[in-house]
């Protein structure tokens, strides 16, 4: 890995411990990133164990190809395709554990050319896979104020969404302005139009940048599909270990595990026979322990871990 863009895996040991690795098990790392979790899983596998890792970032794929362990296979694609990949491998119901480390990796944030960070000047892109989809700069050119407001409010949970969206559209409609193509331009613009608040510790552009990244990569849809796919491919007693980095992600994971742990909810008094109730199915998984957050030591060593949450569940 390039020394310039190092990545420290968050909740590394806790998430791997949550998988309860079997030496001869079959595992999926849905988010290879720079391989921290994958390498840890591989170190615990015996000769007959297998690890299939997934990533849609070409730089992550290049890093994965440096691993020569015959137990390891890298798959280039979004983790929402997890179920499809496992079906093609004819391993549905045979997977002993699935790990999902959500969010943006440190090398992606640190590489200005990827356009994820308002702290660094770079192209206003934000695509996880630069070979598909459109960059944020193009989307902003084509979107109206209502669309931009909705994205910032829905995915950034920013109460100033309307004001920020109006400022962006006003800038773009002024022909005297330079094209909005750089992260530094957008960060400066948001800082100028967002109301000044002494209570807000974060940079004014934090939530909007998060919102645009989530939207342009369809991240929440990807997570929803991946969670459902993981449930479908896991073997009985197989583990699901998910690390999230903001409240939108964590709520999705929490609600998914809760829903699948309860099974179908039958309204009280509904006239169903015992056979009909059984036909509705039962709980498909159970939570393992409580949500885990990083220790103070980990946060001190890696400040980006401070918002992370790990949730673990087991297939029934």
Curated annotation (Swiss-Prot):
Catalytic activity: cytidine(1402) in 16S rRNA + S-adenosyl-L-methionine = N(4)-methylcytidine(1402) in 16S rRNA + S-adenosyl-L-homocysteine + H(+)
Residues where S-adenosyl-L-methionine binds: 35-37, 55, 79, 101, 108
CC terms in the record's Gene Ontology section: cytoplasm
Cross-referenced InterPro entries: RsmH, SAM-dep_MeTrfase_MraW_recog, SAM-dependent_MTases_sf
Keyword S-adenosyl-L-methionine recorded: yes
Keywords: Cytoplasm, Methyltransferase, rRNA processing, S-adenosyl-L-methionine, Transferase
Pfam family, one: Methyltransf_5
GO molecular function: rRNA (cytosine-N4-)-methyltransferase activity
E.C. designation(s): 2.1.1.199
SUPFAM superfamilies, A to Z: Putative methyltransferase TM0872, insert domain, S-adenosyl-L-methionine-dependent methyltransferases
UniProt key word S-adenosyl-L-methionine: yes
Coiled-coil ranges (or none): none
GO BP terms in the entry: rRNA base methylation
Family per similarity comment: Belongs to the methyltransferase superfamily. RsmH family.
Protein role: Specifically methylates the N4 position of cytidine in position 1402 (C1402) of 16S rRNA.
Protein name in UniProt: Ribosomal RNA small subunit methyltransferase H
Organism: Aliivibrio fischeri (strain ATCC 700601 / ES114)
């Amino acid at each position: 890995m390039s020394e310039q863009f190092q990545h420290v895996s968050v909740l590394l040991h806790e998430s791997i411990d949550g998988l309860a690795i079997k030496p001869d098990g079959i595992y999926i790392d849905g988010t290879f990133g720079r391989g921290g979790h994958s390498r840890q899983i591989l170190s615990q596998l015996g000769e007959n164990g297998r690890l299939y890792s997934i990533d849609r970032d070409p730089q992550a794929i290049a890093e994965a190809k440096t691993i020569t362990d015959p137990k390891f296979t890298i798959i280039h694609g979004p983790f929402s395709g997890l179920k499809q990949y496992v079906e093609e491998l004819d391993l549905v119901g045979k997977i002993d554990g699935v790990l999902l480390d959500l969010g943006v990796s440190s090398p992606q944030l640190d590489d200005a050319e990827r356009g994820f960070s308002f702290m660094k000047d770079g192209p206003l892109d934000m695509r996880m896979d630069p070979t598909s989809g459109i960059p944020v700069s193009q989307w902003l050119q084509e979107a109206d104020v209502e669309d931009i407001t909705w994205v910032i409010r829905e995915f950034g949970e920013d109460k100033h969404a309307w004001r920020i969206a109006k400022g962006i559209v006003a800038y773009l409609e002024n022909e005297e302005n330079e094209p909005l193509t750089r992260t530094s331009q957008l960060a400066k613009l948001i800082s100028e139009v967002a109301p000044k608040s002494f209570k807000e510790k974060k940079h004014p552009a934090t939530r909007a940048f998060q919102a645009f990244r989530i939207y342009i990569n369809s991240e929440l849809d990807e997570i929803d599909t991946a969670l459902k796919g993981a449930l479908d491919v896991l073997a009985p007693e197989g583990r699901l270990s998910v690390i999230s980095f903001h409240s939108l992600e964590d709520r999705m994971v929490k609600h998914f595990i809760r829903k699948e742990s309860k099974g179908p909810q039958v309204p009280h008094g509904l006239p169903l026979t015992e056979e009909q109730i059984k036909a509705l199915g039962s709980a498909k998984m159970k939570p393992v322990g409580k949500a885990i957050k990083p220790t103070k030591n980990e946060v001190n060593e890696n400040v980006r871990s401070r918002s992370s949450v790990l949730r673990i569940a087991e297939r029934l």
